[in-house]
């Protein structure tokens, strides 16, 4: 069959047409396009185009010369006629290109620029929960940026957030226990930046601000001498010892600022600054003249106030001595210090330089301190800025788990240099020297060698203390001559815990002077004690200051009957009767909020020779009496923020006490004391 229709002709022309276009492209001399190889260019010229192609591909007229341009072959050197279709290479080919290959008609206009949107680096954030407690503002500036969603830099590691936790799935009712809750600025019960729980500068500097108020109200009965030959509070009074009733009130307001640099746990502080300004307001009301002041015109009541910078010291670490956080630090300024476990010898806040530290992974501790005592205010016992010129040196060393686990042993050496001085207190009573015998200024140099222990052996608790005092008194007022001091003291307490009860038995002994007329002073006396022993402040004998002819038979918050004018402003007196005190006690945790303390003390003088010499009395019995006391401590919030302490005590006089305080026609009766102390902390 013959296939010569129009379609067939079109198909038969496709090959030459394609060859023609390829030839035109290959033979052009446009810049950058190399000519075809000579084998191709030397081929036979193309045959004439059929007539039917003219309307399909119209050819533009050739500009310039119509003669074809010869083309030289690269390898043969023969010339062939250049097809007229190629022209001279300068003419546009849009006329022969298909429509899809032609250039746009007219000049192309540049599109208007599209503004580039402002972009910020993408940050991946995780949900941020508030930190627990009141953290305040952070002073840590961020220095890192987040680079990927797997790591969120948190420069302030103290203020990490915690999610709210409904521990018991109760739907968060009021007044329930929920951890990880945000706090408030003045919330003392949860974590707070002003309590030192979060740093205020950087990540290692903390500020702890503690405001405290202590209100102490006391009713007491003590033997009170009057002045029957000068003036009395009531007419027709003839007895020497009159109405014993007294009421004492004292109130302390203080704010403690404690700035510490270091870590919050384990590692000791690098440095520390502490300031505690304190204000006191006190009042004493009695029923006899000559008590609040030797001037009877001052009446029977006295009100005083006083403020002091009670604590002010700077502490810094000298060195780290081991990888177990052992250290050596130094503290300079007015600071608290207790010489032993129970405060038998010295417990005070005063001006000092103290070096202290630990050894053997905190198993050993040591103190080396020098105190230069400030003078005390008479009625508040706060520090003044007057130099007393008394020098004290302390060295003690503690060893934990000594012999048995849970038992700590201590050895100590203490030196007291109290030079000559003459002092009237703020109430115009003579306190140095003691107004007994030959009241002349004298100097005391005495050293105390101590051995103590505190802890438990199995289920039995044990505390003991021994002191040996050796030294010299240049002129004892009572003995009226130089004294060589050689006196001792011993105390021991054992207790047993049974569930919520503790049963105690203790014994205290201080040597007495058996001959006040010789040159050997053998009655033990402390420096400035505050013993927590045999009932402590709940006991009548311990708490009350029992006056006796210008001095005191026993000092306030002391056990030793030292015939001293004042524990806080007087000098030690080693010519005294001494004391024997056995004790039985029982403490009960009635509830988690209420504790009960019960004690019974039996009191004897170790020797009465010093009393007989002082009172010009023939014979005084040794039995002082029986001291009964009970007390309660109530903490309604189960913390120290609110603590209420109350106690009641009585002294049933023995024959020795009656020999001293009986009137000519009457006997001294039982003496009572009761107190209420409210301590508020924030």
Regions inferred by a protein language model and the residue ranges of each:
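Signature for the C-terminal beta-barrel architecture of outer-membrane proteins
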Residues: 324-326, 335-521, 580-582, 589-592, ...
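Membrane-embedded beta-strand positions of outer-membrane beta-barrel proteins
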Residues: 209-213, 273-277, 330-332, 366-368, ...
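N-terminal periplasmic/intermembrane-space "pro-region" immediately following the signal or transit peptide
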Residues: 27-270, 276, 499, 503, ...
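Surface-exposed loop and membrane-interface regions of Gram-negative outer-membrane beta-barrel proteins
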Residues: 231-251, 261-327, 338, 436, ...
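Outer-membrane beta-barrel "beta-signal"
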Residues: 630, 668-682
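Structural signature of outer-membrane beta-barrel channels/translocons
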Residues: 202, 214, 258-264, 315-319, ...
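Bacterial N-terminal signal peptides
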Residues: 15-25
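C-terminal structural cap/anchor segments
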Residues: 514-623
């Amino acid at each position: 069959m013959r296939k010569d229709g129009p379609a067939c002709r079109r198909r038969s022309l496709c090959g030459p047409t394609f060859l023609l276009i390829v030839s035109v492209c290959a033979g052009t001399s446009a810049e950058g396009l190399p000519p075809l190889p000579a084998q191709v260019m030397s081929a036979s010229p193309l045959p004439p185009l059929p007539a039917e192609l003219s309307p399909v591909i119209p050819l533009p007229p050739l500009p310039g010369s119509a003669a074809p341009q010869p083309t030289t072959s690269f390898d043969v050197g023969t010339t062939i006629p250049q097809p007229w279709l190629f022209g001279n290479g300068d003419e546009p080919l849009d006329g022969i290109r298909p429509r899809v290959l032609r250039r746009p008609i007219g000049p192309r206009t540049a599109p208007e620029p599209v503004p580039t949107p402002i972009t910020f680096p993408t940050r991946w954030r995780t949900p941020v929960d508030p930190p627990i407690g009141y953290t305040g503002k952070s002073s840590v500036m961020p220095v890192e940026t987040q680079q990927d969603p797997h790591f969120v830099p948190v420069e302030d590691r103290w203020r990490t957030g915690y999610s709210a936790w409904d521990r018991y799935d109760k739907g968060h009712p009021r007044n329930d226990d929920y951890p990880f809750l945000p706090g408030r600025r003045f919330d003392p019960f949860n974590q707070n930046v002003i309590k030192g729980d979060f740093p205020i500068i950087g990540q290692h500097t903390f500020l702890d601000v503690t405001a405290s108020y202590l209100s102490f109200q006391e009713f007491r009965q003590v033997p009170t001498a009057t002045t029957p030959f000068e003036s009395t509070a009531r007419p027709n009074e003839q007895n020497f010892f009159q109405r014993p009733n007294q009421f004492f009130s004292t109130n302390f307001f203080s704010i403690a600022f404690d700035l510490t640099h270091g870590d919050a746990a384990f590692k000791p502080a690098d440095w520390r600054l502490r300031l505690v300004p304190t204000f006191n307001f006190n009042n004493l009301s009695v029923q006899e003249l000559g008590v609040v002041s030797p001037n009877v015109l001052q009446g029977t009541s006295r009100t005083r106030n006083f403020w002091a910078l009670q604590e002010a010291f700077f502490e810094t670490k000298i060195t780290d001595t081991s990888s177990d956080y052992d250290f050596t630090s130094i503290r300079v300024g007015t600071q608290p210090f207790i010489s032993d476990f129970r405060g038998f010898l010295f417990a005070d806040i005063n001006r000092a330089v103290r070096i202290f530290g630990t050894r053997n992974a905190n198993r050993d501790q040591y103190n080396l301190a020098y105190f230069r005592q400030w003078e005390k205010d008479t009625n508040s016992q706060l520090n003044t800025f007057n130099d007393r010129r008394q020098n004290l040196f302390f060295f003690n060393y503690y060893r934990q788990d000594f012999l048995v686990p849970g038992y700590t042993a201590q050895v100590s050496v203490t030196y007291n240099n109290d030079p000559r001085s003459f002092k009237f207190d703020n109430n115009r009573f003579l306190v140095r020297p003691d107004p007994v015998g030959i009241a002349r200024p004298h100097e005391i140099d005495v050293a105390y060698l101590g051995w103590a222990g505190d802890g438990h052996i199995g289920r039995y608790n044990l505390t003991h203390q021994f002191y040996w005092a050796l030294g010299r008194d240049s002129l004892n007022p009572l003995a009226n001559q130089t004294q060589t001091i050689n006196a001792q003291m011993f105390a021991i307490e054992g207790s047993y815990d049974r569930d919520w009860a503790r049963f105690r038995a203790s014994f205290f002994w201080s040597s007495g002077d058996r001959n006040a007329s010789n040159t050997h002073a053998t009655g033990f006396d402390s420096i400035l004690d505050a013993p927590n022993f045999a009932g402590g402040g709940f006991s009548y004998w311990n708490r009350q200051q029992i006056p006796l002819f210008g001095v005191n038979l026993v000092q306030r918050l002391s056990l030793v009957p030292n015939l001293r004018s004042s524990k806080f402003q007087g000098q030690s007196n080693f010519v005294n009767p001494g004391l024997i005190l056995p004790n039985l006690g029982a403490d009960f945790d009635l509830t988690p909020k209420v504790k009960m303390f019960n004690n019974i003390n039996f009191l004897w003088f170790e020797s009465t020779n010093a009393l007989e010499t002082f009172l010009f009395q023939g014979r005084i019995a040794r039995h002082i009496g029986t001291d009964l006391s009970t007390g309660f401590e109530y903490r309604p919030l189960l913390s120290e923020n609110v603590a209420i302490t109350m106690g009641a005590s009585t002294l049933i006089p023995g024959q020795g006490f009656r020999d001293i305080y009986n009137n000519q026609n009457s006997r001294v009766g039982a003496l009572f004391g009761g107190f209420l102390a409210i301590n508020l902390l924030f």
